[in-house]
């Protein structure tokens, strides 16, 4: 359970942006970097599905997919000359205004532990 909780924490935008931001990168490169990092984290944690209920695993996968969609959506609203900092700001704005809440996902997973 610890690894899946860490995965969820690590893919929340307010967690991965400070960890990965290279302000001067073009936003397109940063977009790819973020998506690749999330996919690598997910692949590393694939075996965790053995320890979770089908519902908890599905919620985790959906959260990952929705975060990637959010990143792509934020990127489409960036002007061509935007930087990684611009994209990071847009991602956080989208995340704050969205229904995606990592804490809700964590509650579902933690409920299984108890």
Give a label for each model feature.
Residues 1-114:
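Conserved non-transmembrane functional hotspots
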């Amino acid at each position: 359970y610890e690894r899946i909780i860490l995965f969820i924490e690590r893919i929340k935008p307010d967690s991965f942006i400070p960890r990965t931001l290279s302000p001067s990168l073009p936003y397109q490169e940063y977009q790819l970097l973020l998506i690749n990092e999330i996919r690598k984290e997910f692949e590393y944690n694939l075996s965790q599905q053995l320890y979770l209920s089908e519902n908890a695993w599905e919620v985790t996968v959906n959260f990952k997919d929705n975060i990637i969609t959010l990143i792509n959506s934020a990127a489409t609203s960036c002007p061509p000359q935007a930087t990684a900092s611009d994209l990071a700001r847009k991602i956080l704005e989208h995340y704050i205004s969205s229904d995606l809440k990592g804490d809700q996902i964590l509650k579902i997973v933690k409920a299984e532990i108890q």
